[in-house]
Regions:
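Conserved nucleotide-binding/hydrolysis micro-motifs of P-loop NTPases
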Residues: 303-304, 360, 381-386, 440-441
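Secondary-structure boundary/capping positions in well-ordered alpha/beta enzyme cores
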Residues: 52, 86, 296-297, 373-375, ...
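Conserved phosphate-donor/acceptor-positioning beta-strand/loop module used by diverse small-molecule
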Residues: 367-390
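ATP-dependent adenylate-handling active sites, centered on carboxylate activation for C-N bond formation
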Residues: 348, 356-359, 368, 375-376, ...
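Alpha-helical solenoid repeat scaffolds of the TPR/TPR-like class and their adjacent stem/linker regions
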Residues: 1-345
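PAPS-dependent sulfotransferases, especially Golgi type II membrane carbohydrate sulfotransferases
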Residues: 143, 172-182, 186, 193-267, ...
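Short beta-strand segments
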Residues: 275-277, 288, 300, 352-357, ...
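Long C-terminal interaction/binding lobes of large macromolecular proteins
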Residues: 363
Length: 518
């Protein structure tokens, strides 16, 4: 027990109602993994002082760690309203927005934190990290230098510099920069996991595949250790969720599944497209190709079906409720969907709307039931490339990315997702078109013409400028670096790691054969 913990405990015991004491105890409880106790203490602090910026910011941090990002940003905003000059609230807001993929807004918050507290290395490092993610070498250097001047061992700033060095083809300096920092013994952290991943990328580019694989494995181990408390054994993991949906669909009678629309839904697009497949299958590339056409709007990995998810996918009885839905009962879920699209800043009425989410294959029963006129694009890529890419890519924390912490776990998740997707295609009335990644990168014009024909869109040479579209729109997925380039052929990357992939090939073999990649 530290002095601060003991002092706070004693102060509360003698009736001192200063909210700071509750915040101190909450922090220690959270560090000990006692999250419920931490939340209770912070709520007590906010009962005493509802506008206390320290308590509001601390609970926002817990919400962020638990992926309750909306609650987190709302509490940051409340802290800022209470004390606009409280730099820690702006910094936490940057963390939250960055976690949610809202990088432009995150930079604004980090910048305000740095303005208010120029000696805050984390604020400068956050700015550098996002600039590095955007591939902007010039924008990385100043904030990274400021962060490292304050904290020479700052892994976020060092990894940001390393990221742009890799994009510039400078791999050896990355090894020299990151290896000494990562050699120091330290508890697992998200910062170490990210830096290890960047170091693995440098080894990969240098052709040092054994070292790359070992470093990627270490990165995933750190990632798993940091986030393991969020996944106690009694919690359904993402693969379990997929399997449960599959069992429900397998037992359902999907004849006459498509529902008519009871009435017009405000804000609906004239043409509605779902683009799905699996992470790292090429969905971001196709999204930006289509968004290069006039009249096409696209949205990237947003929970547009959240209300329907909660109503129909939350328990085993959900499918019965979905099957018994009348058109009038379905329309509020459709309206909620289009309201989500509008809330993202898109006006899609009169045009084509592309809802890109590689994991919306999970929602094909909902899509078929609620949006029977929608067109569904399914990305296909060599399963070995997908699994290898998911394993070595540094994703933001989600229940899905937690499945990518080992090659075997990644392969089993992919297998579960493909089984559910294929079952959905067999059982449900869906209007689908398959886009093969290998065909897209090797026969771009022919593949995109077929894609446009399916969607009823005019083909244009502007499709070749998808990288400009991506730069203008911004990309929040892990594919940002690839789609900033001109057409990038990522096929057969798995071959250099064939030895490491051998143990999972029996899991992937049926899909390699079924999809024609043998």
């Amino acid at each position: 027990m530290t002095d601060a913990f003991a002092e706070a405990s004693a102060a509360i015991a003698r009736g001192d109602r200063d909210p700071f004491h509750y915040v101190v105890l909450a922090w220690y409880r959270a560090q000990a993994g006692e999250r419920d106790a931490a939340y209770q203490l912070l709520q007590q602090a906010l009962t005493i002082a509802p506008d206390d910026p320290v308590a509001l910011t601390t609970i926002a941090s817990l919400y962020r760690e638990d992926r309750r990002l909306r609650d987190a940003v709302l509490h940051c905003d409340a802290a800022i309203r209470a004390c606009p000059t409280y730099a820690a609230a702006w910094l936490e807001r940057g963390f939250v927005l960055s976690s949610g993929g809202s990088f432009a807004l995150a930079v604004e918050s980090y910048s305000e934190a740095a303005r208010l507290d120029p000696g805050n290395a984390a604020a400068w490092a956050g700015i550098a990290m996002i600039a590095g993610r955007n591939g902007d070498a010039e924008a990385v250097r100043m904030p990274a230098a400021k962060a490292l001047a304050i904290d020479p061992d700052n892994l976020i700033a060092s990894a940001a510099l390393a990221t742009v060095e890799i994009e510039a083809g400078e791999y050896a300096p990355v090894v020299a920069r990151l290896s000494p920092l990562l050699a120091a013994k330290a508890p697992p952290s998200s910062e170490r996991a990210n830096a290890l991943n960047v170091l693995g990328d440098a080894y990969d580019r240098l052709g040092r595949t054994d070292e790359a694989f070992a470093t990627y494995t270490a990165a995933k181990s750190e990632f798993a250790a940091v986030h393991a408390p969020q996944f106690p054994p009694e919690r359904e993991d993402h693969r379990g969720f997929i399997d449960r949906i599959g069992r429900s669909l397998d037992g359902a009678d999907a004849r006459g599944w498509a529902l008519a629309q009871a009435g017009p839904v405000p804000g609906a697009a004239d043409s509605h497209v779902f683009l799905l497949g699996y992470p790292r299958s090429g969905t971001t590339l196709v999204e930006n190709i289509l968004a290069s056409l006039p009249g096409v709007s696209a949205l990237e990995e947003r929970p547009t079906l959240r209300e329907a998810d909660e109503a129909f996918l939350g328990d085993d009885a959900g499918f019965a409720r979905l099957a018994g839905l009348s058109p009038a009962e379905a329309d509020p879920f459709r309206a909620a969907y289009w309201a989500k699209v509008a809330a993202a800043g898109l006006d899609v009425a009169g045009g084509t709307f592309v809802d890109m989410d590689p994991l919306k294959g999970l929602r094909l029963p909902l899509i078929s039931r609620l949006f029977p006129q929608a067109q569904v694009l399914i990305m296909r890529r060599d399963p070995r490339d997908i699994v290898w890419s998911c394993f070595h890519t540094n994703f933001a924390m989600t229940s899905t990315s937690y499945e990518f912490t080992s090659l075997e776990r990644t392969a089993r998740h992919y297998d579960a997702m493909m089984r559910l997707t294929e079952l959905s295609l067999e059982r449900l009335p869906l209007n689908t078109h398959v886009v093969r990644y290998d065909a897209l990168v090797r026969e771009f014009d022919a593949t995109t013409r077929a894609l446009c024909d399916f969607l009823g869109l005019p083909w244009s040479v502007e499709l070749h400028n998808f990288n400009r579209t991506a730069a203008a729109r911004g990309v929040s997925t892990a594919s940002a670096a690839q789609v900033r380039k001109s057409l990038y052929d990522g096929t057969r990357q798995w071959e250099r790691y064939a030895k490491q992939l051998e143990p999972v090939l029996p899991i992937l073999a049926p899909w390699i054969e079924r999809f024609g990649f043998d």
